[in-house]
Amino acid sequence: MAVSKEEILETISNMTVMEVVELIEEMEEKFGVTAAAAVAAAPAAAGGEAEAAEEQTEFDVVLSSFGSNKVAVIKAVRGITGLGLKEAKEVVEGAPSPIKEGASKEEAEEIKAKLEEAGASVEVK
């Protein structure tokens, strides 16, 4: 007389928590396995998939090139970053250069628009 999976599950669902714990311990001893390893591995796999599905929240704005109007781009970089003239000029001339790291999507888009308006090529990563 074979017992079906449904009957086993029905029996387990009628047990108390302590009885289920004892059953698991006995199964671990009988079959030489541990339930903790399987339980610990499952959430890690699910968590990795969930992180990949989440939308990116932090963006880096990178100045690719300053284009034909370097002076306007330097002014825009100074306004965005608060750098001095010399530092802003070094950032612009050293393109590709990060302008802002860890910015929100809205902030990154605003910075990109300001720099492109000044004539620069900009990437948001």
UniProtKB/Swiss-Prot annotation:
**A GO biological process held by the record:** translation
- Gene Ontology cellular component? cytosolic large ribosomal subunit
Offer one Pfam family short name for this entry. Ribosomal_L12
Q: Which domain of life is it from?
A: Bacteria
SUPFAM superfamilies in alphabetical order: ClpS-like, Ribosomal protein L7/12, oligomerisation (N-terminal) domain
Gene Ontology MF: a single term: mRNA binding
What's in the keyword line of the UniProt record? Ribonucleoprotein, Ribosomal protein
PANTHER family (alphabetical):
39S RIBOSOMAL PROTEIN L12, LARGE RIBOSOMAL SUBUNIT PROTEIN BL12M
Q: Which HAMAP family match?
A: Ribosomal_bL12
Family that this chain belongs to = Belongs to the bacterial ribosomal protein bL12 family.
Q: Which NCBIfam families has this protein been placed in? A: L12 (TIGR00855)
Q: What does this protein do?
A: Forms part of the ribosomal stalk which helps the ribosome interact with GTP-bound translation factors. Is thus essential for accurate translation.
Q: How does it assemble?
A: Homodimer. Part of the ribosomal stalk of the 50S ribosomal subunit. Forms a multimeric L10(L12)X complex, where L10 forms an elongated spine to which 2 to 4 L12 dimers bind in a sequential fashion. Binds GTP-bound translation factors.
The name under which this protein is listed is Large ribosomal subunit protein bL12
Q: Which species does this protein come from?
A: Alkalilimnicola ehrlichii (strain ATCC BAA-1101 / DSM 17681 / MLHE-1)
